[in-house]
């Protein structure tokens, strides 16, 4: 089942925590789920080119039910903040209008964007929309992630690859990506690329390392984290979606 399910959801409560944290009554949960969805949609649409990797929403204190703390993790904080904070103030005003609550917006910088699955997938989608060859896009993304300190990377692109009449899936992987190991810190993202031939689906898995007892995800995601595993590096391999038989890449 590790190959089929979303790695992020599978590890919730084990090594990952929730992006929305509340202290509310059960009756309020449906409305807050909808509100969180609208908040994230508004932020992503308001700043489309700001490379947002994660949006955390907190409502922890019952005395301050009308106050929401939103933390936006982005590789380009200047795009969200704007000149003298103008863009940030406009975004806060729109969030207050949407929620009818007091909003505290924190903008946090992501320093190592080449290791974050969502940002990698978004960058791949942009390159595919600019008509770059899909195999080159995958190999470039994998090499950047490994150079940034990732222990394993796997990518998969599905659709009319290269404008072919019949849709198919093709992927590339390097290093270890142990999807069945629950203590393995795996970052996963799925993004769509809208091309002239149709929509391409992009999936990215990043293996940062194993979260040992007494550690957290922050320990495995440090830039150039030490690789204590004795497992030798694996050869790059290409594969097709829906087929578990991996095909070794051709030797030079």
Curated annotation (Swiss-Prot):
Residues 39-111 form the KH type-2 domain. GO terms for biological process: translation. SMART domains: KH. The keyword Lipoprotein does not apply. Pfam families: KH_2, Ribosomal_S3_C. The keyword RNA-binding applies. Residues 222-252 are annotated as: Disordered. Residues 241-252 have a biased composition (Polar residues). GO terms for molecular function: mRNA binding; rRNA binding; structural constituent of ribosome. GO terms for cellular component: cytosolic small ribosomal subunit. Signal peptide: none annotated. InterPro entries: KH_dom (IPR004087), KH_dom-like_a/b (IPR015946), KH_dom_type_2 (IPR004044), KH_sf_prok-type (IPR009019), Ribosomal_S3_C_sf (IPR036419), Ribosomal_uS3_bac-typ (IPR005704), Ribosomal_uS3_C (IPR001351), Ribosomal_uS3_CS (IPR018280). Keywords: Ribonucleoprotein, Ribosomal protein, RNA-binding, rRNA-binding. SUPFAM superfamilies: Prokaryotic type KH domain (KH-domain type II), Ribosomal protein S3 C-terminal domain. NCBIfam families: rpsC_bact (TIGR01009). Part of the 30S ribosomal subunit. Forms a tight complex with proteins S10 and S14. Belongs to the universal ribosomal protein uS3 family. This is Small ribosomal subunit protein uS3. The lineage of its organism: Bacteria, Bacillati, Mycoplasmatota, Mollicutes, Acholeplasmatales. The gene is rpsC.
């Amino acid at each position: 089942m590790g190959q089929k399910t979303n790695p992020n959801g599978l590890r919730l409560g084990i090594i990952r925590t929730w992006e929305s944290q509340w202290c509310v009554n059960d009756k309020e949960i449906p409305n807050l789920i909808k509100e969180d969805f609208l908040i994230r949609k508004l932020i992503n649409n308001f700043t489309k080119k700001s490379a947002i990797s994660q949006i955390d929403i907190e409502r922890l204190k019952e005395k301050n039910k009308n106050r929401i703390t939103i933390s936006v993790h982005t590789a380009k904080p200047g795009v969200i903040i704007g000149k003298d904070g103008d863009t940030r103030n406009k975004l806060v005003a729109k969030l207050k209008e949407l929620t009818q609550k007091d909003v505290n917006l924190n903008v946090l910088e992501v320093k190592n964007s080449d290791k974050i699955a969502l940002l990698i997938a978004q960058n791949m989608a942009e390159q595919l929309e600019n008509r770059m060859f899909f195999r080159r896009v995958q190999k470039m993304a994998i090499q950047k992630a490994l150079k940034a300190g990732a222990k394993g990377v796997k990518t998969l692109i599905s659709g009319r690859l290269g404008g072919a009449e019949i849709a198919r899936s093709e992927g590339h992987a390097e290093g270890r990506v142990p999807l069945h190991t629950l203590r393995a810190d795996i970052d996963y993202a799925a993004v769509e690329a809208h091309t002239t031939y149709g929509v391409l689906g992009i999936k990215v898995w990043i293996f940062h390392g194993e979260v040992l007892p007494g550690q957290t995800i922050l320990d495995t995601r440090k830039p150039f984290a030490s690789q204590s595993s004795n497992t030798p590096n694996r050869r790059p391999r290409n594969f097709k979606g829906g087929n578990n038989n991996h095909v070794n890449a051709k030797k030079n």
